[in-house]
From Swiss-Prot:
Gene name of the encoded protein: Cplane2
Gene Ontology cellular component terms for the protein in this record: centriole; ciliary basal body; ciliary base; ciliary transition zone; cytoplasm
Name of the protein: Ciliogenesis and planar polarity effector 2
GO biological process: axoneme assembly; cilium assembly; cranial skeletal system development; endocardial cushion fusion; exocytosis; limb development; protein localization; protein processing
Pfam families to which the protein is assigned, alphabetical: Ras
Natural source organism: Mus musculus (Mouse)
Binding positions (GTP): 64-65, 67-70, 82, 84, 87, 176, 178, 206
Length: 258
C-alpha cells in the first residue's frame, strides 16, 4: 500500500486564510453563512474565474454514536444534532472546498459527496454497505476519544469496509477531541496505531460551532476555519491518489507522513 503524502506537500495549507483564498471561499458563503448544495448544485463563480472541479465520493464509517453525522454536519456548516439519533438509512451531503495546488499554483474546486449510514441499517440490509462502497474514492474511519471500544474497533472496520480496496484513500478521524479530560485513548495508543497502519489521522472537536451576532446563525467563516485541516487533508490525499493513478507521480513518496 502506498504511503500517503506528507501534510502540506500537495495543497497549500493556509491558502484559505489569504486574500485570494477568501475571495474563492465567498462562493460557498452567503452573508457569512455557509451555502447548502444539493446533489446537482454547484457554487456560482464570476465569469472571469475559470476553475476545474474534482468530484469524490467518500464513505464515512464508524460505530454508532461516534459522531459520523455530526462530523459531516460540521464539514458542511450545518447544525450539529444535540441529541444522538442513529441515521436510519443512507444520507448524502455535498461539500465544496476550494484549494490551491502547491505544484502548479492552480486553484481546484473540490466536491466531496459524503455518504453516511447508520450501523443498524448496515446490519439489517445487506445492500447498504455495497451501495456506500460502490465507486467510493475514500473512506473516513471515525472513533471517539471518549469511547475506547470505538478505537479498538478500527482495525476491524478497516478490514471489513476497505479490505477489498487497499489502494483507496483511508483517513482516520478522532471525534470529541476537546473532551480530553475524559479521553479513553491516550497519545501512546494513537502513536502505536499510526506506526502500524501508516494512515493520516485528524482530530475534531465536538463543541457547538460559533455563532453570528444574532446568536442563532452559525458563523460560516469560523466553521470553515475549524474544519479546514480536515477538508485540506481530504483534498490532499485524493488529489495525490489521482496523480498516482494517472502515472504522474510515483506510488510511494520518499518521506512518510508527519
Amino acid at each position: 500500500m502506498a504511503r500517503p503524502p506528507m501534510h502540506g506537500s500537495v495543497i497549500v495549507p493556509d491558502w484559505h486564510e489569504t486574500v485570494e483564498g477568501k475571495e474563492y471561499l465567498a462562493c460557498i458563503l452567503r452573508k457569512n453563512r455557509r451555502r447548502e448544495f444539493g446533489l446537482l448544485e454547484r457554487p456560482v463563480l464570476p465569469p472571469s474565474v475559470v476553475i476545474d472541479t474534482a468530484s469524490y465520493k467518500i464513505f464515512v464509517s464508524g460505530k454508532s454514536g461516534v459522531g459520523k453525522t455530526a462530523l459531516v454536519a460540521k464539514l458542511a456548516g450545518l447544525e450539529v444534532p444535540i441529541v444522538h439519533h442513529e441515521t436510519t438509512g443512507i444520507q448524502t451531503t455535498v461539500v465544496f472546498w476550494p484549494a490551491k495546488l502547491k505544484a502548479s499554483d492552480c486553484v481546484v474546486m473540490f466536491r466531496f459527496e459524503f455518504w453516511d449510514c447508520g450501523e443498524s441499517a448496515l446490519k439489517k440490509f445487506d445492500h447498504m454497505l455495497p451501495a456506500c462502497k460502490e465507486n467510493a474514492d475514500a473512506f473516513l474511519f471515525l472513533f471517539s476519544f471518549t469511547d475506547r471500544a470505538s478505537f479498538e474497533d478500527l482495525p476491524g472496520q478497516l478490514t471489513r469496509v476497505a479490505g477489498e480496496a487497499p489502494g483507496l484513500v483511508k483517513i482516520v478521524i478522532g471525534s470529541k477531541f476537546d473532551q480530553y479530560m475524559h479521553t479513553d485513548v491516550p497519545a501512546r495508543d494513537l502513536t502505536a496505531f499510526r506506526q502500524a497502519w501508516e494512515l493520516p489521522l485528524f482530530r475534531v472537536k465536538s463543541v457547538p460551532g460559533r455563532r453570528l451576532a444574532d446568536g442563532r446563525t452559525l458563523d460560516g467563516r469560523a466553521g470553515l476555519a475549524d474544519t479546514a485541516h480536515v477538508l485540506n487533508g481530504l483534498a490532499e490525499q485524493l488529489w495525490h491518489q489521482d496523480q498516482v493513478a494517472a502515472g504522474l507521480l510515483p506510488s510511494s513518496p520518499e518521506s512518510a507522513p508527519g
